[in-house]
Design a protein with these regions (language model features):
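Conserved ABC ATPase signature
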Residues: 138-148
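ABC-type ATPase nucleotide-binding domains, specifically the catalytic core motifs of the NBD
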Residues: 14, 108-120, 128
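Short coil-to-helix segment of the ABC ATPase nucleotide-binding domain corresponding to the Q-loop/switch region
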Residues: 100-109
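Conserved ABC ATPase "signature" region
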Residues: 71, 119-134
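Helix-to-loop junction immediately C-terminal to a conserved catalytic motif
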Residues: 55
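ABC ATPase NBD coupling module
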Residues: 72-89
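Conserved ABC transporter NBD signature motif
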Residues: 63-72
Length: 160
């Protein structure tokens, strides 16, 4: 995927409001692969919604979102699987870890889809993020901060 385009996109919850001032909503915007973007705004203005739309997790918006010119509303489940496997990853606010599994098992679930990162690389991230001693610890027995770091490692196991 080389571009993500938003064309007059607006969360449904904001529909009918005349006072929307945004660099994202109700604009034409193209995000290009390899470029860095900062999305910064006040609470309740749609930052998490934007991520959820682009990830295909939610579709309660007006307007059009395209990946490389293709409207994401037309994507099949198989398309989404391939996109999430090869092109896009998301670190959810809710983390979405399996509490009964260990830190390693949670990361390996994602990495097994791509086989992109070696066990050695993943162990290095655990070390770097200060959770190497939690490798075999069930998520339910970890602090929220430790769980966040496991979720970050899991999100990094992508081939892009």
């Amino acid at each position: 995927m080389n571009t993500i385009e938003l064309q007059q996109t607006l969360p449904a919850v904001f529909a009918g409001r005349d006072s929307i001032i945004s660099d994202v909503w109700h604009q034409s915007l193209t995000l290009k692969r390899g470029e860095a973007y900062l999305v910064e705004a006040a609470s309740g203005t749609g930052k998490s919604s934007l991520c959820s739309y682009v990830y295909g997790y939610r579709n309660d918006y007006q307007g059009i979102i395209c990946f490389d010119g293709k409207n994401i509303r037309t994507l099949s489940v198989r398309d989404w699987v391939e996109i999430r496997k090869c092109s896009i990853s998301m670190l959810f606010q809710e983390l979405r870890l399996f509490t009964e599994l260990t830190a390693w098992e949670n990361v390996q679930l994602k990495n097994s889809l791509t086989g992109f990162k070696s066990k050695k690389e993943i162990k290095a991230w655990f070390e770097q993020f200060g959770i190497a001693d939690k490798w075999d610890t069930p998520i339910a027995k970890m602090s929220f901060g430790q769980q966040q770091r496991v979720a970050l490692v899991r999100a990094l196991c992508q081939p892009f």
